[in-house]
Amino acid sequence: MLSLPPPEFYKLWIINKSPYQLFNIYRSGIMKVKVLDASAIIHGYNPIIEEGEHYTTPEVLEEIESKKIIVEQALDFGKLKIMSPNREYIKKVEEVVKKTGDNLSQQDIGVLALALNLNAILYTDDYGIQNVAKKLNIEVRGIAFEPTNKDFIWRKICEGCKKLYPVDYEEDICEICGSPLKRKMVKSRLKKKRKKK
């Protein structure tokens, strides 16, 4: 079921957009809620000049000193809101992060949880965040770079015999040959089977 549009949707009526045009704009995602991580703001995303509702977390604000003026203006104009996600969504993200092995900070997890909480589009150039977002079916858009289309997980790999271990494997030495282990990105997407002619 389609939820009611945000206030910006109705403001567009004033500039003589037809109801049909307005509805298409809303459905296209322009007016959808957007969550911004630190990389999105640092790489030039400006909530003041963009349509839609923008949110970020308190932790992100601590990392974006270089864009402090823009952020403060966006907050003053009501174009950016600060919100912490509900704990249940943080737990969901943490479960996925544990499976993928992505090395994400609590700030990264918070941004993902907020996007999940608000059913929002997530703006980020961080490939680790994008990877976890895919697993959570969160729509992602990049700013300076196109979002990665790769689907991967992290594993530990033996430098000697190449045996793979889960990323949370506690030892740093291979149980088979005794060589050291290192983290490695592994594709998790299965290759599609070719159809028989």
Swiss-Prot record:
SMART domains: PINc. Zn(2+) binds at C158, C161, C174, C177. It comes from the Archaea. GO terms for biological process: maturation of SSU-rRNA. Residues 147-152 are annotated as: Flexible linker. The keyword rRNA-binding applies. InterPro entries: NOB1 (IPR039907), PIN-like_dom_sf (IPR029060), PIN_dom (IPR002716), Ribonuclease_PIN (IPR033411), VapC_family (IPR022907). Mn(2+) binds at D37. Residues 153-188 are annotated as: Zinc ribbon. Its EC number is 3.1.-.-. One of its GO terms (cellular component) is preribosome, small subunit precursor. Its cofactor is Mn(2+); Zn(2+). Keywords: Endonuclease, Hydrolase, Manganese, Metal-binding, Nuclease, Ribosome biogenesis, RNA-binding, rRNA-binding, Toxin-antitoxin system, Zinc. Transmembrane segments: none annotated. PANTHER family: RNA-BINDING PROTEIN NOB1. Belongs to the PINc/VapC protein family. Has 2 structurally independent domains; the N-terminal PINc domain which binds Mn(2+), rRNA substrate and probably has endoribonuclease activity, and the C-terminal zinc ribbon domain which also binds rRNA substrate. This is Endoribonuclease Nob1. It comes from Methanocaldococcus jannaschii (strain ATCC 43067 / DSM 2661 / JAL-1 / JCM 10045 / NBRC 100440). The lineage of its organism: Archaea, Methanobacteriati, Methanobacteriota, Methanomada group, Methanococci.
